[in-house]
Amino acid sequence: MNQPTSSNNGAIKGVQKIRTLIEGLDEISHGGLPSGRTTLVSGTSGTGKTLLAIQFLYHGIKHFDYPGLFVTFEESPRDIIQNAHSFGWDLQSLVDEGKLFILDASPDPDGQEVVGNFDLSALIERIQYAIRKYNAKLVSIDSVTAVFQQYDAAPVVRREIFRLVARLKHLAVTSIMTTERLDEYGPVARFGVEEFVSDNVVILRNVLEGERRRRTIEILKLRGTTHMKGEYPFTITNDGINIFPLGAMRLTQRSSNARISSGVETLDKMCGGGFFKDSIILATGATGTGKTLLVSKFLEEGCRRGERAILFAYEESRAQLSRNASSWGIDFEEMERKGLLKLLCSYPESAGLEDHLQMIKSEISEFKPSRIAIDSLSALARGVTNNAFRQFVIGVTGYAKQEEITGFFTNTTDQFMGAHSITESHISTITDTILMLQYVEIRGEMSRAINVFKMRGSWHDKGIREYTISEGGAAIKDSFRNYERIISGSPTRIAVDEKSELSRIMRGVQDKTLPE
């Protein structure tokens, strides 16, 4: 039996990783990309492959002082520098300082004809020369597909890519090599062989879900080391690629026993003294049941106590929100003038869910609020899959809890009267407190009802109470004690005789349980 060979230099080390400092990538890769190895980044057109390759080099040079080499087969060095400048990355200064070298291997615009045996010997030698001359530690190659687009023989492609990868490994550089694929969920790469000669494979996707594009990243393999499995959404911002590693989030947030007021005294009593600080509250109900009013009272109460608050509105404009709040005696404009309130209004269709999530996180990070509200979640759910929407809600709630912020969200149900589910997207388990608002028909008149459907970690009132809206705002009255089946949407009045009979039966049961 063969025994493992020993080295005089000490024990064999495992795969070392180099941090990329790309937001979220180090989390899903469990520490970064494997050092001294090549990572294949594959994706269709417009997925962000070139951007990832440039950002990887730029961060390595700026944060770790690793010299870098960028090999381009498609764009000119001028275009690459100009495009990177849009993200605030000054590649030209790095080139002038000798920290970055851009090797132009783009094809002749007049075209080339392949004659004889095809190989990359000359190109590999050019890359090796540049690596040694500039002492490069990081290399990005964009993209190998352009090299082989005139030569479709898979065995030749596999052989030449293997030679290139082997030479890069011999030179001990950490490299990214981009390649194109034809379908989002088809073969990993165009020629079907690239992934087999690479130690690491990352797939970028840009999928049309409903009416919106959704970018995701998946680490298919990192040979010899661990990584997170599955697809993770990402967006492209002014700072580059931003990945949301929702699966990397841990349920380690602190929980506070402190209570905060909802702004409605009776609702505070129904919740055992108010909402828990850093909890997530969901108000769900049909349109017009008073969800936005509860949100407005919640924000007003925070500002009255000198706390900062943000309202992310996706159904009403700033002017409309201010006008409606004013009719309830709430002055949003005065709160904004004092710097306590921020109203951010936009259409849900103006951006993808990942872009909305990034905007929410950025605004929270900048404004530092104690309370946030989203009105409404159901507007954001339009035109996206349930899984994508649930990931968005997890991202928002997780970040709010991490920052110890109390969140109040609304959800509009399709059911006008009665209720079959709390939300259509099954996000109720993510929230801590659920307020159910609905219409009920009592004696030929339409009334509103409210009840605390759920509240984690606290006693709460189980009654279904009447909820009225007037110029003074919200008022919660007594329970509908003489009615049953209100939640089902078919309230039935309990007759006095029936109540007496029930009382008689209960007294009889109690008498039987008394000792003789």
Curated annotation (Swiss-Prot):
Cofactor binding note from Swiss-Prot or TrEMBL: Binds 2 Mg(2+) ions per subunit, one in each domain. Mg(2+) is required for hexamerization and phosphatase activity.
Listed InterPro entries: Circadian_clock_KaiC-rel, Circadian_KaiC_bact, KaiC, KaiC-like_dom, KaiC_C, KaiC_dom, KaiC_N, P-loop_NTPase
CDD domains tied to this protein: KaiC-N, KaiC_C
PTMs per UniProt: Phosphorylated on serine and threonine residues by autocatalysis. Has a 4 step phosphorylation cycle; the autokinase acts first on Thr-429, then Ser-428. When Ser-428 is modified KaiC switches to an autophosphatase mode, acting first on phospho-Thr-429 then phospho-Ser-428.
Protein's organism: Picosynechococcus sp. (strain ATCC 27264 / PCC 7002 / PR-6) (Agmenellum quadruplicatum)
EC number, UniProt record: 2.7.11.1, 3.6.4.-
Residues with PTM Phosphothreonine: 429
GO MF terms held by the record: ATP binding; ATP hydrolysis activity; DNA binding; magnesium ion binding; protein serine kinase activity; protein serine/threonine kinase activity; protein serine/threonine/tyrosine kinase activity
This protein's domain notes: In the homohexamer the 2 domains (called CI and CII) self-associate to each form a 'donut' layer; the compactness and local conformation of the domains varies over the cell cycle and impacts function. CII has the autokinase and autophosphatase activities, both CI and CII have (weak) ATPase activity; CI has the clock pacemaker role.
Binding site for Mg(2+) 1: 50
Annotated binding of ATP 1, by residue: 46-51, 86, 221-223, 225, 227, 237
Protein name (Swiss-Prot/TrEMBL): Circadian clock oscillator protein KaiC
High-level lineage: Bacteria, Bacillati, Cyanobacteriota, Cyanophyceae, Oscillatoriophycideae
UniProt-annotated binding residues for ATP 2: 287-293, 328, 448, 454-456, 458, 460, 462
Keywords, comma-separated and alphabetical: ATP-binding, Biological rhythms, Hydrolase, Kinase, Magnesium, Metal-binding, Nucleotide-binding, Phosphoprotein, Repeat, Serine/threonine-protein kinase, Transcription, Transcription regulation, Transferase
Sequence positions that bind Mg(2+) 2: 292, 315
